[in-house]
Amino acid sequence: MTWFIDRRLNGKNKSTVNRQRFLRRYKAQIKQSISEAINKRSVTDVDSGESVSIPTDDISEPMFHQGRGGLRHRVHPGNDHFIQNDRIERPQGGGGGGSGSGQGQASQDGEGQDEFVFQISKDEYLDLLFEDLALPNLKKNQHRQLNEYKTHRAGFTSNGVPANISVVRSLQNSLARRTAMTAGKRRELHALETELETISHSEPAQLLEEERLRREIAELRAKIERVPFIDTFDLRYKNYEKRPEPSSQAVMFCLMDVSGSMDQATKDMAKRFYILLYLFLSRTYKNVEVVYIRHHTQAKEVDEHEFFYSQETGGTIVSSALKLMDEVVKERYDPGQWNIYAAQASDGDNWADDSPLCHEILAKKLLPVVRYYSYIEITRRAHQTLWREYEHLQATFDNFAMQHIRDQEDIYPVFRELFQKQSANQSA
């Protein structure tokens, strides 16, 4: 039986190249469909694949066809209803066979098509979802770059310590050397052994010639055996080299209001925003730490599960979260070595006397050390004192941004607005 092994990189996905070309060509339509689809998903289903529909008109190809007017004779095979000069009635409702409601304008060609629907994978979905997004003001910390190295494999070397010896590569070199050094002698030995076999069976016996052949065979075998099995020339060691790694370590503080004024719908929208943020960070950057802080009258640093699923609630003192963030930064994240970011989500309801304190903490302690601070207010009500205090900060600090979310449909556009990749001129 003959076996055919497909060793192509795209062996199981032979249309991958065509698929990628299609995604590039219709990226605008696909991204529009994705931005509409994300609002229909549950909080826990944000990162799966998606069925994308594109209007047929957007994917139509240019083609040659007959012009309108003129007289033409056509033959329709299998026709048993009409004869020459009969007139064919126009189909009812325009004859569109597509997915329209049938209440629009009549179709001039009597035909229609459904929208083109196809499935994109999780990776394709996330790539399109977070395309052109980046953490603002992300900088390389140069003084850490001088001291921070990462070890990489760099082939093999003939010198090294015994711990790094490559046994397989050394034995391969040994076999190659012994084969090269003894190949001629082995061919000569094989010829002498064949000659000895012939003489030993010949009549009359040729004792002197047989003795000579035996001596030569013994000498050749001794020469072959004197070739060492392993030599220092054969030894190979795994080679490692240290390459400087630019340090772009970042930490994101997620501050979520869980006070009693935050109803379940508002909390769900806040969680949806933070899930988008988490997926964006984990997919785009290698080493980004996330610090989760929940607050009502008191703030507490929690893990990921408690941040999204805890039912604890209470009053509202926003400054408690800002104070805790300041303490964590001073304790664990030196601003000279870390890119510090923060995303705060709240419904804007805060104890009136606490809002000026929030302004003071941000202006004097946090905003001078963070790369970017974003505030998202989720409410349908009029803005309160916290929003007005933060407006003063936005006018003073370039690294402070604030956005307003009213409904679930606003989450993704607001997210893209906050983390839109900056141009070179803006970042400068």
UniProtKB/Swiss-Prot annotation:
Start-end of Gly residues biased regions: 92-103
Signal peptide range: none
Domain of life: Bacteria
Region (Disordered): 78-111
Biased composition (Basic and acidic residues): 78-90
Pfam families: DUF444
InterPro entries: UPF0229
PANTHER family hit by this protein: UPF0229 PROTEIN YEAH
Membership in a protein family: Belongs to the UPF0229 family.
Protein name per the record: UPF0229 protein YeaH
Record organism: Salmonella typhimurium (strain LT2 / SGSC1412 / ATCC 700720)
Source species taxonomy: Bacteria, Pseudomonadati, Pseudomonadota, Gammaproteobacteria, Enterobacterales
Recorded name of the encoding gene: yeaH
